[in-house]
Amino acid sequence: MKIIAVLGSSGSGKSALAHRIAMEQNCKIFSLDSLSIYKYLDIASAKPTLLEQSQVCYYALNILEPHQKSNVMIFKDLLLQSIEDIKNNSPHTPLLIVGGSSFFLKSIMEGLSPMPPLEEHEEWVKSLGNISMQYAQLTQIDKTYAQSLSPTDTYRICKALALFKATNTPPSIYFATHKKESLGYDIEIFCLECERDELRERIAKRTKAMIQKGIVEEVQNVLEAYGAQAPALNAIGAKECVNFLQGKVATLQQLEEQIFFHTCQLAKRQRTFNRTQFAQITHLKEKALEAQLIQQIHNNIL
């Protein structure tokens, strides 16, 4: 079974490219997007339209309620379910993994240790104070593991502390006795390259379109139903709209500027991650990438 990942910065056009190829080459798409997995935020996530979803089979869309937490294990389980579905029903159909959440893909490919539920211990972690205080606490609990992390790596520090609270075991010992489970499938990784100025222009156009399509009203509906603490509302686009609705952002123009600025920052981080964190990845511009993807799909069929 052929599995190809198409990564790229937010706004680079990877989703449109993948959809076009999936239609032409009879592929299915797994959405590697930390916001599209949520229901009710179609505009904020730039989710495929209902028409597009009728044209191509998409996995990992509209899975979680806005109050639920997303994590890499959920994406791994969904990916395995998608692969099994294809193997059972259309084994020669290629699967395109498409999105900007490259960290999730890297973690899935490197393997994940089985983890207990950690959500109930997050308040305890927060009670320890800011990230510096949390890191100091982790150093006391497990100096070896703490030294393997950056003192500003909020995600891993909080996860390690919650794991200790859940298991009463230092993280280094826990991970040594709970080995990583690999995905078991090869994934060829490509990244859509986009020049900086072109990307900023694309992000600006997309941000303006989101405002015009009603992202504020969409977020307001979720805010009223689930509250400002809903994890889905922490995403770029949604969180700025929450601030606007709470009077912390004065005008729609300022809202648009904030979403644009934060999306550009995200795109820069994504670009750096994609360039540095994968041992094997092919970076190509759109036309070259399209030709290469089609060639890879044809090679699989022959």
UniProtKB/Swiss-Prot annotation:
Listed cofactors: Mg(2+)
> Which residues bind substrate per the record?
S10, G11, S12, G13, K14, S15
Keywords for this protein: ATP-binding, Magnesium, Nucleotide-binding, Transferase, tRNA processing
Q: Which InterPro entries match?
A: Dimethylallyltransferase (IPR039657), IPT (IPR018022), P-loop_NTPase (IPR027417)
Top-rank taxon, per record = Bacteria
- GO MF annotation list: ATP binding; tRNA dimethylallyltransferase activity
- Known catalysed reaction(s)? adenosine(37) in tRNA + dimethylallyl diphosphate = N(6)-dimethylallyladenosine(37) in tRNA + diphosphate
Q: What class of enzyme is it?
A: transferase
Sites where the protein binds ATP: G8, S9, S10, G11, S12, G13, K14, S15
Positions of the site: Interaction with substrate tRNA? S101
**Alphabetized Pfam families for the sequence:** IPPT (PF01715)
Instruction: Reply yes or no: does the keyword Magnesium apply.
Output: yes
- Please name the GO terms of the biological process aspect recorded for this protein, alphabetically: tRNA modification
Give me the ranges of the annotated region Interaction with substrate tRNA.
Answer: 33-36
> Per the UniProt record, which EC number(s) apply here?
2.5.1.75
The entry's family comment says: Belongs to the IPP transferase family.
Quaternary structure note: Monomer.
Q: What does this protein do?
A: Catalyzes the transfer of a dimethylallyl group onto the adenine at position 37 in tRNAs that read codons beginning with uridine, leading to the formation of N6-(dimethylallyl)adenosine (i(6)A).
Q: Cite the NCBIfam families for this sequence.
A: miaA
Question: What's the protein here called?
Answer: tRNA dimethylallyltransferase
- Origin organism is Helicobacter hepaticus (strain ATCC 51449 / 3B1)
Q: What is the lineage of its organism?
A: Bacteria, Pseudomonadati, Campylobacterota, Epsilonproteobacteria, Campylobacterales
Q: Which gene encodes it?
A: miaA
